Amino acid sequence: MSIDLNWETVTGGPDGQELADQIRDFIHTKFQSVPLPRFIKSVTVHDFQFGVIPPELELKDITDPLPDFYEDHVDSDVASDDSEGEEDAVDNNLAPPSQGERHQRTDDSEALGGDVRNLGHLPPHLMFGSPGGPGGPGMGSLRNGDMGSPFMRVSTPGIPGGTSNLHYFHSHLGGGLSGTQTPLAAVAGAQHLSTANWLEGHGHSSSVPNLTHFGNPGGAGTSPRRQPERNHSRNPSQGSISVADLNPNSLAPPSSSTLGVPSLKEKHSTTPAPGSATALSGSNEQQQQQQPQDNDDGHPRWREQRIDDMQAVFRIRYAGDVKLLLTADILLDYPMPSFVGIPVRLSITGLTFDGVGVLAKIRKRVHFCFLSPEDAAAAVGGDGEEGLSSPGEGPSQAQGQGQGQGQGQGQGQTPGAGQQKQQKKQAGWVGSGNTKLGGLLQEIRVESEIGQRESGRQSLKNVGKVERFVLEQVRRIFEEEFVYPSFWTFLV
């Protein structure tokens, strides 16, 4: 079934010009990565035009998409967005929190709900040592995941009267017990206690002094509960960071070299997005999420096949006036190697193409590629012999030419310019009973301009080599980028 293609609509207007510019830039980029021969200095692509002659399209078959089209490239720009809830996460480049994380944040908020409201009525040392205060289980034993939670933005009241007395109280009451210098006391009393001494006891268990002589704001003499002994983590409590921020002697938060802890990001006043991970918990979660992906590097992910996925197989024939303008600098070796470079202007004024293309529609993606000669012969089935004909000639003529080439000289054909032209088109074809396509690009017409001509020949001998090199690279770029298993994916 033939398909009429409105070539002017596809290639005309601003969209067509933008597409032509993108193709020009793509070819230019590919030429920059090609190793050039010694006699060529550089290759530059200047212009690309589609021309006015459209290709001929013929629908051959409608089948299921190729298996490779279902491969999900996680590291690509078009990662899987099949599920509805996954699209928002892909757009924001954020991973949604797990159910356990949301439950954990809810428990933390409930645990802090009653204590945070009464922090302002307690003395500073009791506030940091109470079970519900920042030094207790609610905040003092924060895990890595809680350090970046929105509750970090709760302002910690200042410590009136200075912090040296607090260190004096802890050091005398604790006596010779190891680990009584908590991170809060170490930061607050840094002028009396060196960092090295605090680090020596930082890894030991700590206990909070029994502050029985301090009461509640209401006057009830209930004593706070005693903290169970536990090992300190490498992360300082929130209170220690807040005290350092409020210390008038320091203008910057404590560094990792001073506290012996990993450097923390600056606290911001902005609230994290509901579906985003926090600063420090996100790093741990990303490591956990990336670990399964790293383990699956050798096993690609595959999207689920659906009944509405389809693939169309086309026979594409083209003998048009597509134009590609580029320049190549030829190096002259006289009077010394690479003495000077002379630009050579090469113009591709048209090409002849005959091949089989595949267009697959899978949900929001359209995949396109050309088939190799072997795959094309299998896809068109009984039309494999017809696939040898160039635009404008019938299957019988192409079959006769193939048999004639297999015998050395076609019978019944008069040698002449027309036959030489056909033989030039068939240069890469194997002439046997099992004839198949030898290359998708059958013919590329090139015009070169350089210097002056002498007796109809170029004045430089390397012009022919430059032409062959450019044509080989154009053919190689086409086959590597557009022929299956390589394919192009478009989002629709």
Swiss-Prot record:
Record bears the keyword Isomerase: no
Superkingdom, natural source: Eukaryota
Biased composition (Acidic residues): 78-90
Biased composition (Gly residues): 130-139, 401-415
Spans traversing the lipid bilayer: none
Subcellular location: Mitochondrion outer membrane; Endoplasmic reticulum membrane
Domain SMP-LTD: 1-492
Keyword terms, alphabetized: Endoplasmic reticulum, Lipid transport, Lipid-binding, Membrane, Mitochondrion, Mitochondrion outer membrane, Transport
CDD domains the UniProt entry points to: SMP_Mdm12
UniProt biased composition (Low complexity): 246-257, 387-400, 416-428
Entry membrane topology: Peripheral membrane protein
GO terms under biological process: mitochondrial genome maintenance; mitochondrion-endoplasmic reticulum membrane tethering; phospholipid transport; protein insertion into mitochondrial outer membrane
Residue segments, region Disordered: 68-158, 199-301, 379-434
One GO term describing the cellular component: endoplasmic reticulum membrane
Molecular-function GO terms, alphabetical: lipid binding
Record note on quaternary structure: Component of the ER-mitochondria encounter structure (ERMES) or MDM complex, composed of MMM1, MDM10, MDM12 and MDM34. A MMM1 homodimer associates with one molecule of MDM12 on each side in a pairwise head-to-tail manner, and the SMP-LTD domains of MMM1 and MDM12 generate a continuous hydrophobic tunnel for phospholipid trafficking.
Similarity section: Belongs to the MDM12 family.
Annotated function: Component of the ERMES/MDM complex, which serves as a molecular tether to connect the endoplasmic reticulum (ER) and mitochondria. Components of this complex are involved in the control of mitochondrial shape and protein biogenesis, and function in nonvesicular lipid trafficking between the ER and mitochondria. MDM12 is required for the interaction of the ER-resident membrane protein MMM1 and the outer mitochondrial membrane-resident beta-barrel protein MDM10.
Name listed for the protein in its UniProt record: Mitochondrial distribution and morphology protein 12
Organism: Chaetomium globosum (strain ATCC 6205 / CBS 148.51 / DSM 1962 / NBRC 6347 / NRRL 1970)
Lineage, highest ranks first: Eukaryota, Fungi, Dikarya, Ascomycota, Pezizomycotina
